[in-house]
Every structure is written in C-alpha cells, then in structure tokens.
C-alpha cells in the first residue's frame, strides 16, 4: 500500500457530509491535493487506495443517500471488504458501519461491524444530548496504530453499541461510557470529528494516510 505521499483518497460525496472541512483536514494532514478525489463515482472509489466516508445528519437519511447513488454500496464493499482498502468512517459515516440504527425508526446499515446505533441516554442529568464539545478519548487497546489518548471534538445524539467487544477500540465519558471508535482489519470508524479536533485530529488523519493494515 502506498503512503500518504502517493496514495489516492476517495472522499465520498453523497450529500450528507461536511466535505470541505474533511477535505481541508486531509490536505493539512499531508495528503497531496492531486491525490484527493471527492467523488460520487463508484469507479473512482474502486480505483482509490483509501476511502473516507463522512456523515452529518440522521442515520436513515445518510444511508438512503448512500444507497441512492447507483452501484456505490457495491463499490464500497468491493474496495473495502474484498480489496482491503483502508477505510475511515467519520461520525454518521462510522455509525453506518453498524447492522442497524434506531434513529427515526429501525433502519439497516452497511453491517460491516456487528452492532447497532442507539440514542444517547446519559445517567447524569448534567450531561446533555446532543453530546457536543471536547472530550477525552480512552483507549480499550494500546495496540491500534491509529489511536492515541487525548481530547477530540464530538457532536452526536446517537452512539454505536458494538456486539463484539474486540471491535470497540476507544470510548469517551458522557454520563456513562460512549463508543468513540470501532474497527476491525482495514476498517476504522470514529464518532469524533477529526476535522474539528485540531492537532489531535490532524495527527490521527496523518496516521490513517500512512496506515497499511
């Protein structure tokens, strides 16, 4: 796998992500502009060395928007699950990795990481929903090459509840433990926003650009 100096990154444009902020953060993390492909074209996804799926909004509408692009979901499955391309899902892009989400009804996700996305229910009344702002990242494993302890920026009302504890890579505290990152093999999903997390987020993205799982 190529490193960040030469690898192409497909940033999926499906009308449900803060593309400009994520694109700018990837460029600030070391990605060459000519290697960033903001795309809704499945063929470009298949040609890319790495894939980033952002997401802002509700689980159902994001999944619907992704499915509305002809052949996009099959292209993602081929690139990530078959070819093993490094994949990063951000916020709702991470939640879509689940089997299902419970926002505005029960809706099917990509099913790449077993689990479901459920409403945040803090056990401390001082912890408001949505969970918004800076919070500590606690690691459940010290061996994953992408993750470090530190502070990151969150904005969400629902959280990923993984079925397999081995896929839970990091948590944060918001009236109880909340999933901050999930992953397996070449797949990484983060609930926090790297593009809003200043140096912590840029360093995380830089490691993703060099990641060769």
From Swiss-Prot:
HAMAP family according to UniProt: HisH
> What lineage, starting at the top, does this entry show?
Bacteria, Pseudomonadati, Pseudomonadota, Alphaproteobacteria, Sphingomonadales
What the entry lists under SUPFAM superfamilies is as follows: Class I glutamine amidotransferase-like
A GO biological process held by the record: L-histidine biosynthetic process
Record-annotated disulphide pairs: none
* Gene Ontology CC terms: cytoplasm
EC number(s) recorded for this UniProt protein: 4.3.2.10, 3.5.1.2
Its catalytic activity?
Answer: 5-[(5-phospho-1-deoxy-D-ribulos-1-ylimino)methylamino]-1-(5-phospho-beta-D-ribosyl)imidazole-4-carboxamide + L-glutamine = D-erythro-1-(imidazol-4-yl)glycerol 3-phosphate + 5-amino-1-(5-phospho-beta-D-ribosyl)imidazole-4-carboxamide + L-glutamate + H(+); L-glutamine + H2O = L-glutamate + NH4(+)
Quaternary structure note = Heterodimer of HisH and HisF.
Q: What keywords sit in the KW lines? A: Amino-acid biosynthesis, Cytoplasm, Glutamine amidotransferase, Histidine biosynthesis, Hydrolase, Lyase
Species, as recorded: Zymomonas mobilis subsp. mobilis (strain ATCC 31821 / ZM4 / CP4)
Tell me the active site: 91 (nucleophile), 193, 195
Kindly list the places in or outside the cell where this protein is found, as annotated in its UniProt entry.
Cytoplasm
Please identify the protein, giving its name as recorded: Imidazole glycerol phosphate synthase subunit HisH
Q: What does this protein do?
A: IGPS catalyzes the conversion of PRFAR and glutamine to IGP, AICAR and glutamate. The HisH subunit catalyzes the hydrolysis of glutamine to glutamate and ammonia as part of the synthesis of IGP and AICAR. The resulting ammonia molecule is channeled to the active site of HisF.
Which top-level group of life is the source organism from? Bacteria
* Signal sequence coordinates: none
Molecular function (GO) terms for this protein are:
glutaminase activity; imidazoleglycerol-phosphate synthase activity; lyase activity
Would the keyword Lyase turn up in this protein's UniProt record?
A: yes
